[in-house]
Amino acid sequence: MAPKAEKKPASKAPAEKKPAAKKTASTDSKKRTKTRKETYSSYIYKVLKQTHPDTGISQKAMSIMNSFVNDIFERVASEASKLAAYNKKSTISAREIQTAVRLILPGELAKHAVSEATRTITKYSSAAN
């Protein structure tokens, strides 16, 4: 058996292994996309301009209104979910939402909310056809 040929030295010295650096926002080559925060600001602003065209709203007031809408949404959704569970249904329908609104909002406010919602849904349905 012939002796093994000696290996020729590599023309370039092998690169030294660098210790793995911890990835942080500053060293990461990819730019992090800013997470989108969903708010009701644009809708609140549109309603404000429909009712009071010459009135503005501060950032703090908009934040308060956004929190208010989120709170009411959570309350109605939670109550509607309970109502659906009581009736052994897995779907929240308009009836559950309407009943939840009547339970959560007091007196006249509930009546006005239900009538406005009914009117708006009727208007939306007729526009879609």
Swiss-Prot record:
Residues 1-37 are annotated as: Disordered. It comes from Meyerozyma guilliermondii (strain ATCC 6260 / CBS 566 / DSM 6381 / JCM 1539 / NBRC 10279 / NRRL Y-324). Keywords: Acetylation, Chromosome, DNA-binding, Isopeptide bond, Nucleosome core, Nucleus, Phosphoprotein, Ubl conjugation. This is Histone H2B.1. The modification N6-acetyllysine is found at K7, K8, K12, K17. Monoubiquitinated by the UBC2-BRE1 complex to form H2BK123ub1. H2BK123ub1 gives a specific tag for epigenetic transcriptional activation and is also prerequisite for H3K4me and H3K79me formation. H2BK123ub1 also modulates the formation of double-strand breaks during meiosis and is a prerequisite for DNA-damage checkpoint activation. The gene is HTB1. Core component of nucleosome. Nucleosomes wrap and compact DNA into chromatin, limiting DNA accessibility to the cellular machineries which require DNA as a template. Histones thereby play a central role in transcription regulation, DNA repair, DNA replication and chromosomal stability. DNA accessibility is regulated via a complex set of post-translational modifications of histones, also called histone code, and nucleosome remodeling. InterPro entries: Histone-fold, Histone_H2A/H2B/H3, Histone_H2B.
